[in-house]
Amino acid sequence: MGLLRIPLYRLYERRLERALSNAPKPRHVGVILDGNRRWARLSGLSSPKEGHRAGAEKIFELLDWCDEVGVQVVTLWLLSTDNLARPPEELEPLFEIIENTVRRLCNEGRRVNPMGALDLLPASTAQVMKEAGTTTERNPGLLVNVAVGYGGRREIADAVRSLLLEEAAKGTTLEELAERLDLDDIAKHLYTRGQPDPDLLIRTSGEQRLSGFLLWQSAHSEFYFCEVFWPAFRKIDFLRALRSYSVRQRRFGC
């Protein structure tokens, strides 16, 4: 960033902050952290790992920005179930970065909720995720959902499976369950059970699709698609997303 652009950037940032001071803000923000590999390639870096590492650092900036505006829940989609099919030479360093990121979240006192098919992850990564959820569950402040090995359809299937097992343990027959089953019964078994549904979903890198992110929970969410790659995501990009959200008239229907 040039010397002239730095003060202009700060002025614009403060202008956005003033405009948002009394505006409605989301309680729950979901973010698809997209574009790490493309950012690394366009930046002339030697491997995708460098993009993933830069993207991991950006997470901590985002959480600070969320703290500043009073967001209560952030859901971060770090790795999808589809991504698990990538070559081992890319996944191995990525899992290491994810483990280090989750440990740092714990060390900084964040409340971490692991989301995803942990049984599909390497044992060490799954263990780090599980321990984070257990050791930080009573931490105050911002709740950070960390989605690794996550897929929206898989989450719904897991929720239904969990519900069926719970009801079977009570002796409920399938006919009895089918008779009284409603949406809340399934929602109580989602990875985000007990949390508010996301108000705002952000995807970086210019892709304009959700790819199944929070498929059940996003029925009434507002979407914001940002052109920049995740490692280059700035505070003004976040504030612009909040500004866009603040002027929308939310309709909880068609």
Swiss-Prot record:
Site (May play an important role in product chain-length determination or in allylic substrate recognition mechanisms): 59
Any single GO CC term annotated in Swiss-Prot or TrEMBL for this entry: plasma membrane
Active site, per annotation: 34, 83 (proton acceptor)
Keywords noted in UniProt: Magnesium, Metal-binding, Transferase
InterPro entries referenced in this protein's UniProt entry, alphabetically: UPP_synth-like, UPP_synth-like_CS, UPP_synth-like_sf
Matches recorded under Pfam families: Prenyltransf
Entry binding sites for Mg(2+): 34, 222
Catalysed reactions, semicolon-separated: isopentenyl diphosphate + (2E)-geranyl diphosphate = (2Z,6E)-farnesyl diphosphate + diphosphate
Cofactor mode of binding and number, as noted: Binds 2 magnesium ions per subunit.
One Gene Ontology term from the biological process aspect of the record: polyprenol biosynthetic process
EC numbers for this chain: 2.5.1.68
Cofactor(s) recorded in Swiss-Prot or TrEMBL: Mg(2+)
CDD domains: Cis_IPPS (cd00475)
GO molecular function, one term: ditrans,polycis-polyprenyl diphosphate synthase [(2E,6E)-farnesyl diphosphate specific] activity
UniProt: substrate binding residues: 35-39, 52, 80-82, 86, 203, 209-211
Function comment: Catalyzes the condensation of only one isopentenyl pyrophosphate (IPP) unit in the cis configuration to E-geranyl diphosphate (E-GPP) generating the 15 carbon product (2Z,6E)-farnesyl diphosphate (Z-FPP or EZ-FPP). Only geranyl diphosphate (GPP) can be used as isoprenyl acceptor.
NCBIfam families listed in its UniProt record: PRK14828.1, uppS
Assembly: Homodimer.
Similarity annotation: Belongs to the UPP synthase family. Z-FPP synthase subfamily.
PANTHER family for this protein: DEHYDRODOLICHYL DIPHOSPHATE SYNTHASE COMPLEX SUBUNIT DHDDS, DEHYDRODOLICHYL DIPHOSPHATE SYNTHASE FAMILY MEMBER
UniProt-recorded name of the protein: (2Z,6E)-farnesyl diphosphate synthase
The organism's taxonomic lineage, starting at the top: Bacteria, Bacillati, Actinomycetota, Actinomycetes, Streptosporangiales
